[in-house]
Swiss-Prot record:
Composition bias type Polar residues, residue spans: 283-294, 345-356
Role, per record: Rho GTPase-activating protein which may be involved in clathrin-mediated endocytosis. GTPase activators for the Rho-type GTPases act by converting them to an inactive GDP-bound state. Has activity toward CDC42 and RAC1.
Site feature: Arginine finger: R713
Subunit-structure text: Interacts with SH3KBP1/CIN85.
Protein name: Rho GTPase-activating protein 27
Domain called PH: residue spans: 477-593
Membrane topology: Peripheral membrane protein
Gene name as annotated: Arhgap27
Residue span(s) of domain SH3: 6-69
Protein source organism: Mus musculus
């Protein structure tokens, strides 16, 4: 799915690639070339442009690497630590710089044997294509638990004064990054096994040791970067007590439920909460896990991670000041994503009594601490805020709940015996699934409970007002979903020329039938995760719609449904399976019947005061009068006339209060369109002799090259042309260099569509017969002179626009050997577009021949008819 790019983002080519575009351009990229990223169009192709002023093009996303974006992020706020916490040493702030390992005269490494292990070693394999290097493009480096705490070291400036300047590292002599702790943002990545790697941190005094002669080793590779810990604010670190209780992995936090007062346990790594103690504590020893946001406990300091900013790669990473472990931010996100997938594959459906519900997570129990918790620290599983039943086993009225042998909660309707299974989505939010028709919805269908109906009493019978029942809340349910073939034949009363059948993911939900654009990704996860559906292409309201089987003259396909909406649009829906289309017919028909009943009730009810500016009833006065006449035959015959006059008076006041069209235009509610607007009116509005859209199209076509084969003859994608038309009509800022309009045939098609949509063609209707009579003249000189005089009698906007268009088409004809567009071909394309009668005549084929001849003559005599200024 396409994603816009914010800011200046560049990509670096890593592999050569070459291809030929649709417009005939040859695109070639070479390694180490840099381009500006404009748009991530798809998963495999990105839209880029060479800086500065280059033409945009597409290149494969797998062949390039995205460079880090520029700009320094704002430092995170530092929350204060409560005073009552015991004072503990704060984590040291380090200045990380890239230095090289000293190499002895014999080429051996100066690294001591006791701390041997290169910083860059074989990368520990992880799933998801994780990046292990600290700097983009660097070697795969490991950051693991050291054998001993990291020791403070001397600064590099002291080393320089000592006379042993470190050599340049892999990233250059000036490559370094600063690490500043961000209090309140702590994460705990999964600890590594001791066998994964060895200590990778090296202190500055070790670098100054002389090389060992007994460990000769030929160094063929470039010097490897070594991270040196430089102490900025040295503080005495209190040693850990030997009697401290051992830390458990994974880490659990203890919280108190504000509703029940019971303590519960929360795992910040997985987001799981439980009432039961996840670990057994020895007698006389209590070691509750502390909150992730607290850094005052010396016991939990080992598992606390600080969030730091790498100025070199401009990325956030996490560092444990005691264990020496470091991790990228995306590593913790991948751990959370893996856990979310595990929760989705194995949902927790075990029965729970009201006292055994899942306890709340910290964001629910402590809402005031949400500002200090980063979003990626814990999962919101079981912490949704949507209203629901107090317990899964507490069934709504009219339903009974039981546990199946598969440990699933089955709800049964006590009246219709309808059964629904309770499941949970990836966020722990419950939803209900009907195994009979595969329908899914967030809540159980409401069971109508009989209630005493209130009788409407007139003011003549009683002064007591009738009790108004509260409006029944409508539940938006997912009635049906699947893949269907569909096409739109009529758009709001306007019949479309062609039927374009396409396959789309179709959803019937809450009385609305929605056709989505992309069916590949939606069909797989649409029922399970409705939020992943793509952008809807068509949305049809079933209220007031009609459904029937399409006759043969509408479509030759089998199993075709015809759906007509209230706004005058018509759709054809088809599926190869008769059983599937029958179920769709039943579901849509039931939805239409239910909504039609509601529509009739709404028409019989009283209209709101917002519709007519008054709370008086203006509705079904005829039925009221009929009932009153039947009840009291002695009613005055003038009562009906008075009601009619009252309604007429109310309607007149309502129409008089309507704003004028000009006032709506002045306020910006109505914007005049470009397509379909009169040429003179459009030029006057834009204050230009030629419409701006025509000028933009001509400039863009000539800039991209007039040697493209079939220019103005090959049709562009109709859907893209309609999108461009919508963009022109609703947005004043039009950029034809955007990647969406890369195909030049889309621009030429939009230009031809603009001239076809004119209310009056470029050659006005009043001049049509005169041009036809002039082209029929036998004398060539007289014919040319007559056509030239007629062109000069055209209105000024028509004449200026025709001049610009004809001169552009002449330049297209000059490249006829490459684009194969001769004078005859161009005349055939633009003849019926520029010159047409007001009413279609019987001799239409013969008239079309004369139309083409008129345009062909103007193209030949362009220099004479339109002399240069």
């Amino acid at each position: 799915m396409a994603a816009d790019v914010e800011g200046d983002v560049y990509v670096l080519v890593e592999h050569p690639f070459e291809y030929t575009g649709k417009d005939g351009r040859r695109i070639a990229i070479q390694p180490n070339e840099r381009y500006r990223l404009l748009r991530r169009s798809t998963e495999h192709w990105w839209h880029v442009r060479r800086e500065p002023g280059g033409r945009p093009f597409y290149l494969p996303a797998q062949y390039v690497r995205e460079l880090p974006a520029l700009g320094d992020p704002a430092p995170a706020p530092q929350p204060s630590v409560p005073q009552q916490r015991p004072a503990v040493p704060e984590p040291l702030a380090y200045d990380y710089r890239f230095v090289s390992t000293p190499v002895g005269a014999d080429g051996s490494s100066a690294e001591p044997r006791g701390r041997a292990s290169s910083l860059c070693g074989p990368a520990r394999q992880r799933t998801g294509g994780q990046r292990n290097s600290l700097a983009p493009g660097g070697p795969a480096c490991l950051y693991v638990r050291p054998a001993a705490p990291v020791r403070p070291a001397q600064s590099l400036d002291d080393l320089a004064r000592g006379g042993t300047a470190p050599p340049a590292g892999l990233l250059g002599s000036a490559g370094h990054f600063k690490a500043s702790s961000v209090a309140g943002s702590w994460v705990c990545p999964r600890p590594l096994a001791p066998s994964d790697s060895e200590n990778v941190y090296e202190a500055i005094p070790d670098l100054r040791c002389p090389p060992r002669a007994e460990s000769p080793k030929q160094v063929d590779d470039p010097p490897e970067p070594v991270y040196a810990n430089v102490e900025r604010q040295p503080r005495a670190t209190s040693p850990r007590s030997a009697a401290a209780p051992p830390r458990l992995s994974p880490v659990w936090e203890t919280h108190t439920d504000t509703g029940t007062g019971r303590p519960y346990y929360y795992n910040p790594d997985t987001g799981v909460t439980t009432w039961e103690s996840p670990f057994e504590t020895p007698e006389g020893t209590t070691s509750p896990a502390t909150s992730r946001a607290s850094v005052g406990s010396g016991e939990s300091l080992e598992t606390e991670w600080g969030q730091y900013w790498d100025e070199e790669s401009r990325r956030v990473f996490f560092y444990n000041p005691l264990t020496g472990e470091t991790a990228w931010e995306d590593e913790t996100e991948e751990l959370e994503e893996d856990h979310q997938e595990q929760l989705e594959m194995q949902p927790s459906l075990s029965p729970r009594s009201p006292g055994q519900q899942r306890p709340p997570t910290p964001e629910t129990d402590y809402p005031e601490l949400l500002a200090s918790y980063p979003e990626e620290d814990y999962s919101p599983v079981g912490s949704f805020s949507d209203p629901g039943p107090a317990s899964p086993l507490v069934a709504p009225p009219g339903w009974s709940c039981q546990i199946t042998p598969d440990k699933q909660m089955l709800y049964t309707n006590q009246f219709t015996q309808e059964q629904w299974v309770r499941l949970e989505d990836q966020h722990g939010k419950p939803y209900f699934y009907n195994p009979e028709d595969s329908s899914v919805q967030w809540e159980l269908p409401q069971v109508p409970i009989p209630a005493p109906r209130s009788v409407r009493k007139s003011s003549q019978d009683s002064d007591t007002p009738a009790q108004a029942s509260p409006p029944e809340e409508k539940i938006k349910t997912l009635d049906k979903a699947g893949v269907l073939h569909r096409t739109k034949t009529v758009d709001k009363g306007k019949r479309l020329r062609k039927k374009h059948w396409s396959t789309s993911w179709t959803v019937l939900e809450g009385g609305v039938l929605t056709f989505f654009k992309d069916s590949k990704t939606s069909a797989a996860g649409g029922l399970r995760q409705p939020s992943k559906l793509s952008t809807p292409e068509y949305t049809v309201e079933l209220k007031g719609a009609s459904l029937s089987w399409a006759p043969k003259d509408k479509s030759s396909k089998k199993n075709v449904l015809e759906l007509r909406s209230r706004d005058g649009s018509e759709y054809l829906i088809q599926h190869d399976s008769e059983a599937i289309i029958s179920t769709w017919h039943k579901a849509i028909a039931e939805g239409i019947s239910e909504l039609s009943a509601d529509l009739l009730q709404g028409e019989e009810g009283e209209p709101s005061s917002a519709d007519f500016g008054s709370s008086e009833r203006l509705g079904s006065w005829r039925e009221e009068d009929v009932r009153q006449n039947a009840a009291s035959p002695s009613l005055s015959p003038g009562g009906l006339e008075s009601d009619l006059s009252r309604v007429r008076h109310k309607l007149r006041k309502f129409l008089q209060r309507r704003p004028t069209l000009q006032s709506l235009r002045d306020k910006g509610y109505i914007k005049d369109q470009v397509f379909g607007c009169a040429l003179a009116q459009l030029c006057e509005r834009e204050r230009s002799p030629v419409p701006r859209f025509v000028q933009q199209c001509i400039r863009t076509v000539e800039a991209r090259g007039l040697d493209i084969d079939g220019l103005y003859r090959i049709s562009g994608n109709l859907a893209t042309i309609q999108k461009l038309r919508y963009k022109v009509d609703h947005d004043e800022r039009l950029d034809l260099d955007d990647g969406r309009w890369e195909d030049v045939h889309v621009i030429t098609g939009a230009l031809k569509l603009f001239f076809r949509e004119l209310p009056e063609p470029l050659f006005p209707f009043s001049h049509f017969h005169q041009f036809i009579a002039a082209i029929k003249l036998q004398d060539p000189a007289q014919r040319s002179r007559c056509v030239r005089d007629l062109v000069r009698t055209l209105p000024a906007p028509n004449q200026d626009t025709l001049r610009l268009l004809i001169q552009h088409l002449c330049r297209v004809i000059e490249h006829g050997e490459q684009n194969r567009m001769t004078v005859q071909n161009v005349a055939i394309v633009f003849g019926p577009t520029l010159l047409r009668p007001e009413m279609e005549e019987a001799s239409m084929p013969m008239t079309m021949v004369f139309q083409n001849q008129v345009v062909e003559l103007i193209l030949h005599q362009c220099a004479d008819i339109f002399p240069p200024h």
